[in-house]
């Protein structure tokens, strides 16, 4: 049966995902940045309360995946922390200036991760040569690759995803970006073994007093009084679709 991973940005969201049938959680901070490394407090809380597998993302900033020496040092430290806390896996990725896997740095990450299952995240979708990159990741011992097939969403990239799945010695290929209940059957029918979804919605802040005259964000038009949360009903719906597809 296909595995359902839910992207979560808080302990509450991780618990919602777990309660509604998620098989695994990718734990992140900063949804507007596409996911950054969670704080130590969030990591410890989730480790204590969430029982399904949780893979934290290790990404020190938004933007590209070519990091300075200082940023890479922070990545290695975060990898060691996640390992010490007892998480079963993590999510990360590093590219060089030419859009290839930065093999020396990824080798250091794999050594620091030890027995943890490492997912190479959507840095893959920014690489120059996906098939060569897939071979490099297999050589590194990467467990899985999260990809939209190098398109803006995974449905548009499904043909590329299927090409990657068919590649010899490929890691597990997990489809992600825009995967929802209404299009999930396309991925299941194509034989995709793992799918990744935010299954989320914007939730209004409970604050009654709102100072509309300023913003805490660099984006002056950002909505300060809403947050992105996992929709439990959406997770349950996706899990039900997977189970019914398996029963066919």
From Swiss-Prot:
Highest taxon of source: Bacteria
Keyword Cytoplasm included in the entry's annotation: yes
InterPro entries associated with the record: CutC-like, CutC-like_dom_sf
Membrane-traversing stretches: none
A GO molecular function held by the record: copper ion binding
Gene Ontology CC terms, in alphabetical order: cytoplasm
Pfam families cross-referenced by the UniProt entry: CutC
Assembly description: Homodimer.
Name under which the protein is recorded: PF03932 family protein CutC
Lineage: Bacteria, Pseudomonadati, Pseudomonadota, Gammaproteobacteria, Enterobacterales
